[in-house]
Amino acid sequence: MRVGVLSIWLADRYLPFWVSYLQALEVEVVHPEEDSVNLPFPPPIRRVLGQVFSLKSQGVDFLLLPDVQLGVEARKGSPSPWLVDLSATLERLVPGLPPTLVVPAELSPEVAGLAAKIGQNLTQNPMLARRALERTKHQLSSSFTLPKQPGTRLVGVVAQPMLLSDTEWLGSLRAGLAEHGLHLFLADKTPAELRQEGAYLELDLELPTDLEAAGMHRHLSRLGKVKGLLYLHDPQYLPLPNPLRKLLKKSHPSKPWRLVGLEASWTRLASELAKDLQV
């Protein structure tokens, strides 16, 4: 039995437990190889598709995918399918997609029941699944490590959190900012804390990732050491919530800020921000 896993799209939040658990089940965990796809999507979306095509080509039996909304369904509006149903979105784009195992993109003790069910289905051995869960369930306690973010002239980033787990994309943004003496700063609160920050804005947001993005805005706007703000918005794939964008139009942040897409010229953008910050 071989289960493929992604290395992006919030993988750092849920994958450590699932890799340990699958290995304890004596299931082979398959990681994606570098596989670029020539499709008309922004780089972060192409990377997701590239990893999925790579895992498919490696002949995995199942594909482990995250539910980034943690079981919450949107009752209004038409959110991007990339935000609300990654599995169904990939089924439309990847012919012959392996069967998917969808798990919450965050860890908590409540995930144990789902893990037990998946383990029994994969192994057809309830005793093995129970032993594997006993050995690994201590990893279900969600942990958060503050990112090390040295430097001055900090620029905070507000975006859908899936984007901020893409280290390759972040690397290109960091490099562009650094050319003009600026440094990237990611919100230094847990996802749950950011969702609470977002709720304080009373924007009537439903989806956890929308609340998290709104929380980034509130937290970074109030953080004195952050001198500028960068809002990443792609209306088709990774949009910021409409109420947050309306708030930005109505009440501009007190710091220099920009709202840009996923394929902006980071060097040019950094040059503009540096002038505003008088760097």
Language-model segments: which ranges?
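An N-terminal assembly and electron-transfer interface module characteristic of large anaerobic redox
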Residues: 1-279
